[in-house]
Amino acid sequence: MSKKALCIISGGMDSTLCAYLAKKEGYEIIALHFDYEQRTQEKERECFKQICKALKVEKSYILDVSFIKDIGGNALTDKSIDIPKNELCISDTPPITYVPFRNGIFLSIAGSLAEKENCESIFIGVVEEDGSGYPDCTDEFIQKAQEFINEGTSKNFKVYIKTPLVRLNKAKIVELALKENVPLELTWSCYESEDEACGECDSCLLRLRGFEKVGFKDKIKYKS
């Protein structure tokens, strides 16, 4: 029986690279995507499907967690809150694009699904880069989430949460993705737009900076 990994894939660059690294390690990939009524939900779902096809994933899940929008309090699900432009948020305080406890919610659900599918690992593309203030993207949080999941699941089940990118910056991530032949043109990072990336939000700026530092042109379309 082959070993299985549940890969949480948003459609973005980091989670996609994680899935490719899982495949390289010999895992049979089960892909998991969450719809939470984020601004770019349709684009992210489309990217997820294309990435699954590129990875030749045989089993995938798209789960509706739209209750996250009902909780609100962030610019990704509440269009009345402006997404900051042309400034990289480097702070100990979570930015307005932080979705409260999103990764905690995702990992709780992933733990349940991993037990059902008998996966030995969960891959998630969290990155601590630049002290962005996302409290659920730290290595410490992930370790505690792993303990929580293993404490609350069957005694004969144990899962490891793998975060191969947690200590890398975007330049290193782009460099590694290119080395592993990850189709970055299938990924999406923009917080705001679905047709052409805005090139101005925090996520776009980090992505563009990563490509610039490795001297490689990003193949996705930008508005400017």
From Swiss-Prot:
Zn(2+) binds at C190, C198, C201, C204. HAMAP family: QueC. It comes from Campylobacter jejuni subsp. jejuni serotype O:6 (strain 81116 / NCTC 11828). Its cofactor is Zn(2+). Its EC number is 6.3.4.20. Belongs to the QueC family. Binds 1 zinc ion per subunit. ATP binds at I9, S10, G11, G12, M13, D14, S15, T16, L17, C18, A19. Pathway: Purine metabolism; 7-cyano-7-deazaguanine biosynthesis. It catalyses: 7-carboxy-7-deazaguanine + NH4(+) + ATP = 7-cyano-7-deazaguanine + ADP + phosphate + H2O + H(+). One of its GO terms (biological process) is queuosine biosynthetic process. Catalyzes the ATP-dependent conversion of 7-carboxy-7-deazaguanine (CDG) to 7-cyano-7-deazaguanine (preQ(0)). It comes from the Bacteria. One of its GO terms (molecular function) is zinc ion binding. Keywords: ATP-binding, Ligase, Metal-binding, Nucleotide-binding, Queuosine biosynthesis, Zinc. Signal peptide: none annotated. This is 7-cyano-7-deazaguanine synthase.
